[in-house]
Design a protein with these regions (language model features):
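Intrinsically disordered terminal extensions that flank WD40 beta-propeller domains
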Residues: 1-111
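Intrinsically disordered, low-complexity regulatory regions of eukaryotic regulatory proteins
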Residues: 4-6, 34-36, 42, 50, ...
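WD40 beta-propeller repeat fold
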Residues: 77-242, 249-251, 281-283, 322-326, ...
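Short, well-ordered alpha-helical segments in soluble proteins
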Residues: 212, 233, 244, 254, ...
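Eukaryotic tandem repeat interaction scaffolds
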Residues: 250, 257-369
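Nucleotide-binding motor/catalytic cores of P-loop/tubulin-like NTPases across gene-expression machines
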Residues: 382-383
């Protein structure tokens, strides 16, 4: 009726029902009704893993405990170094970066170069592009060494095996690529055909990373999951949920105990590879997380985002340590410097350490859609050097293990090599 409100309609309906069925036949409940849930409640749940996953977790636990023990020994030794030694090492590592310049630009593909990665011995640079092609280039001449027509869609993930080019047989797995076709391919240095193709993701594969052991590989995907693979057996070991949107970035801690994932939900998560549980939630970015990199010290992590910032996280304090206003546009990639020599000391027969202080982790680089590559010190988070190209968006960056070069992949279908003239 005109002007009738909801209580009036209820009263009128009550009178109609009483007149029709009698007062005793009608039961009216005035208890408030709980609103229907449009969405399922978020809850933590666990899925029983396979026996193969159990074996993998045990192997990763044994590996990580030994690596952590050696790293702790190294850090204890470095803690006794004098301030003069630390300052001299810092100057030796950072001062040359200030004179870096563009050594050359190379057209790498028919479409944007989405990812660049140096081989562990810094003798090769691998590039992946939106054309689905992966290429190898010799360093420092940037001459082509091989091309792999890897995928039917854009390559968005590329990673070198930890022992590639430094002891791995040429016929063994040296590299892996992931792409928009949902597949991950593993490659040797002897053939332009993949050794294996890992399938399981239901959408685009983004960043990928090898576990430091080299036996396992993690992949992030737009299907909202990241997965763990046994690369030797070409077998999926685990499907991990935990993000409300697409998962873009993935990286392993140096000793292999932790793995970090970052999503387009602006949330990052640090997972314990030995138990599968979440160790830390990275909540602070305003937009999607595009890059993740663990520091060689094992307890710090840098994330980069579409909010133009890089955040430094401390895994011991479980919080964000510092926010760097890194670029004027999205920060697409981040990589720490890891020295070619082992970051862990060798020991004399009498048990004394023989290596000098390691340069690993003293600085890192970020790539931005503002056309810049920036190098930052990893102790005070200050800008050391800004490298500007002329090709628009910089989509990826990497640092060579010999400390001589920086490589950047660009929207303009090219990659640049930076260093000393």
């Amino acid at each position: 009726l005109f002007g009738e409100r909801e209580p009036d309609r209820r009263a009128r309906l009550l009178h109609v029902l009483i007149d029709r069925h009698g007062k005793n036949a009608v039961h009216i409940s005035h208890a408030p009704q709980a609103p229907e849930e449009d969405e399922e409640e978020d809850e933590e749940f666990y899925t029983e893993g396979s026996h193969d996953l159990l074996i993998a977790r045990r192997r990763m636990a044994a590996f990580s405990l030994q690596r952590a023990k050696e790293l702790l020994r190294q850090q204890r030794r470095e803690s006794t170094a004098s301030m003069q030694e630390v300052a001299a090492l810092r100057q030796t590592a950072l001062e040359p970066l200030k004179s870096y310049t563009n050594l050359g630009t190379q057209v790498a593909a028919e479409r944007p170069v989405s990812v660049v990665r140096f081989s562990p011995d810094a003798s090769l640079l691998a590039t992946g592009s939106w054309s689905g092609k992966a290429s190898l280039w010799s360093i420092p001449n940037a001459t082509p060494c091989g091309t792999m027509h890897a995928h039917e869609d854009r390559i968005t993930g590329l990673a070198w095996h930890p022992r590639a080019t430094i002891g791995q047989p040429r016929s063994a797995i040296h590299m892996a690529t992931g792409a928009g076709d949902g597949a991950i391919c593993t490659w040797s240095l002897e053939s332009e055909r993949p050794l294996s193709v890992l399938r399981g993701h239901e959408a685009r594969v983004c960043r990928i990373a090898f576990h430091p052991m080299g036996d396992y590989l993690a992949s992030a995907s737009f299907d909202g999951t990241w997965r763990l693979w046994d690369v030797a057996r070409a077998q999926e070991l685990m499907l991990q949920e935990g993000h409300s949107r697409e998962v873009y970035a993935i990286d392993f801690q140096g000793d292999g105990a932790l793995v970090a994932s970052g999503g387009l939900d602006a949330i990052g998560r640090v997972w314990d590879t030995r138990t599968g549980r979440t160790a830390m939630v990275l909540d602070g970015h305003a937009r999607e997380i595009l890059g993740l990199a663990f520091a060689p010290n094992g307890y710090q992590l840098v994330s980069t985002s579409g909010d133009d910032t890089a955040r430094v996280w401390d895994l011991r304090m479980l919080r964000s340590l510092y926010t760097i206003p890194a670029h004027h546009s999205s920060v697409a990639d981040v990589r720490f410097f890891r020295a070619a020599e082992s970051s862990l000391p060798s020991m004399d027969e009498d048990g004394s350490d023989t290596h000098s202080l390691s340069r690993s982790g003293l600085y890192f680089a970020t790539a931005g859609y503002d056309g810049l590559v920036k190098i930052w010190s990893a102790d005070d988070w200050q800008l050391v050097k800004s490298l500007r190209g002329d090709a628009g968006k910089v989509m990826s960056v990497d640092l060579s293990s010999d400390g001589q070069y920086v490589a950047s992949g660009e929207w303009a279908r090219t990659f640049k090599l930076w260093g000393h003239v």
